[in-house]
């Protein structure tokens, strides 16, 4: 049974002999637990890989942090993991970190680094009324990269952006087992809901938001389509893994790294087990 011991930096089940086959190691990173939505898509497509999930609960959330801080922090964390494990591929499952840190990561490391971007292009193709909502953090909504995506792929649509850090907190709360109020979501979505023609397609531009998909569907008008980039990231990961030349292999069990063992993290452990992880450790930087 998994236990959390005060003063220790590890949460893990009792030791069980492992006869796992050798397989490539994929690191999935996010500032919080939203990246689990991306990890879950990848794992469904590629169930036999060795997975490490790392989240920066010490500096969460990234939305209000400076670009320089995010670049240095993400590079430092990925480096700390790769010093302990031979990585075949890294997925930055955080929109904010992806739009900022990918060039630095790709310059520093030789393994492929995959990022997530708001699914503006597929949403523009799916919309029926030409009105697309972009639901993201305020930082993602404001970034030039997001504006470039819209200008490139959605010129024929009306894009209505809505930035919300509250939804990130609600997604984390849901994963902790809390019930999310639909009326609270409707207050956040009010700028869209009071329009004569609200978006019929909504881009979930933060990896936390797919965790709230059921609640968002209940809060939005009937028939609203939700679009995220998780499945596309999974397909990209599968293609890259298939085309790697002699990737490093591991027989380790799936592992989660956090930056601080806290009571909140300890309560996450049963949930992380359901996602297929076998241990949770503090990552020393």
Curated annotation (Swiss-Prot):
Active-site residues annotated for this sequence: 94, 206
InterPro entries xrefs: Asp/Glu/hydantoin_racemase, Asp/Glu_race, Asp/Glu_racemase_AS_1, Asp/Glu_racemase_AS_2, Glu_race
Catalytic activity: L-glutamate = D-glutamate
Any one GO molecular function term: glutamate racemase activity
Keywords attached to this entry: Cell shape, Cell wall biogenesis/degradation, Isomerase, Peptidoglycan synthesis
Positions of substrate binding: 30-31, 62-63, 95-96, 207-208
E.C. number(s) listed in UniProt: 5.1.1.3
Pfam family of the protein (one): Asp_Glu_race
Listed PROSITE patterns: ASP_GLU_RACEMASE_1 (PS00923), ASP_GLU_RACEMASE_2 (PS00924)
EC primary class: isomerase
Biological function: Provides the (R)-glutamate required for cell wall biosynthesis.
NCBIfam families: glut_race, PRK00865.1-1
Family indicated by similarity: Belongs to the aspartate/glutamate racemases family.
Protein name, per record: Glutamate racemase
Species, as recorded: Pectobacterium carotovorum subsp. carotovorum (strain PC1)
